[in-house]
């Protein structure tokens, strides 16, 4: 939000995103649109869920008429676990783009070397790294781009001087101008404890553990077949599983090849005390791609509704939406995966 409201969008701006961005990043587009700027999404490939790099390259190169150009780039998909090529950051910057790197899904299990990769802005969520506290994030800003962010309002703790009679104010000339109100000083000390905990384990060890568990999950899932040969599980994402994080997106099918609704899988998993995430995971781009929702279908729905929700759209379109996501991370062990497989085996031959 800080980048969105403070970036100098205008009618000659271009905001470029991937269709694999989280809604926390997608929302920035409203700031650009409100100033008359252009918003473009680089698509991802169906089922493979990797970037259409030719499209992205064309958009980056064909932008000479724009003044302020911002690329929002996810280091890793929060849904599929796909790690996008970070070389695009420098490629974009060399063409005059500023780059906002969403590293929230990446840094819990990967090292982000900011001496090598130099985005202009980086967003991080601490609770996704070590589970606590929620509600405290981090925005890293390249010092050279700090003054480019023009905060449009102020609140307590962000100003050095305010006048009521002349309606003038001066913002604090450092990062405090973006820290509205009283900081959450009761929870902030937990961040140091969490970071020390991760450092003691070692991010390299965490990365290797997640890779090992991910490989084991894939092997077990791919062997789940009904007696007639129909696969129980469809795994979305690239065939090469090497460059993936710890999240895996799935769909499930009965013996006749009919897809289960994701709510049904989640409800049955709950009976086994297994917590699964289902829905669109705050990432509508992957959901729309995987479920083959066309631009015309989506435009028709939104133009005929003043409000709506997930279930209403499913009913209107007559198409399946959503999927199921499983995650492996620092707290996961092989027994957790075995319990998941034991549950899924109860769905076989049904």
Locations of regions flagged by a protein language model:
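Pyridoxal 5′-phosphate
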Residues: 1-350
């Amino acid at each position: 939000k800080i980048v969105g409201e403070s970036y100098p969008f205008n009618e000659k701006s271009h905001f470029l995103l991937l269709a694999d961005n989280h809604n926390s990043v997608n929302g920035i587009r409203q700031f650009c649109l409100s100033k008359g700027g252009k918003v473009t999404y680089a698509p991802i490939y169906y089922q493979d869920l990797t970037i259409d790099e030719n499209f992205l390259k064309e958009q980056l190169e064909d932008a000479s008429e724009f003044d302020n150009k911002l690329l929002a780039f996810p280091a890793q998909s929060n849904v599929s676990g796909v790690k996008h090529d970070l070389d695009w950051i420098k490629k974009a910057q060399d063409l005059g783009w500023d780059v906002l790197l969403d590293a929230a899904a990446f840094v819990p299990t990967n090292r982000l070397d900011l001496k090598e990769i130099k985005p202009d802005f980086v967003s991080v969520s601490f609770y996704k790294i070590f589970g606590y506290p929620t509600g405290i994030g981090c925005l890293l800003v390249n010092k050279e781009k700090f003054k480019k962010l023009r905060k449009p309002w102020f609140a307590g703790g962000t100003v050095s001087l305010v006048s009521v009679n002349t309606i003038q104010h001066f913002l604090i000339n450092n990062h405090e101008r973006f820290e509205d109100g009283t900081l959450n000083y009761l929870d902030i000390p937990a961040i140091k404890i969490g970071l020390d905990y991760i450092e003691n384990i070692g991010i390299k060890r965490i990365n290797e553990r997640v890779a090992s568990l991910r490989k084991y999950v894939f092997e077990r899932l791919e062997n789940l077949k009904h007696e007639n040969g129909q696969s129980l599980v469809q795994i979305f994402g690239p065939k090469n599983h090497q460059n993936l994080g710890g999240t895996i997106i799935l769909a499930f099918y009965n013996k006749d090849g009919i897809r289960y609704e994701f709510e049904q899988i989640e409800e049955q998993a709950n009976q086994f005390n297994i917590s699964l995430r289902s829905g669109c995971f705050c990432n509508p781009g992957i959901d729309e791609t995987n479920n083959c929702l066309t631009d015309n279908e989506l435009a028709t729905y939104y133009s005929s509704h003043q409000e709506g929700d997930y279930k209403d759209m499913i009913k209107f379109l007559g198409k399946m939406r959503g999927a199921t996501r499983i995650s492996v991370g620092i707290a996961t062990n092989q027994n957790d995966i075995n319990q998941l497989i034991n549950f899924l085996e109860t769905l076989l031959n049904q």
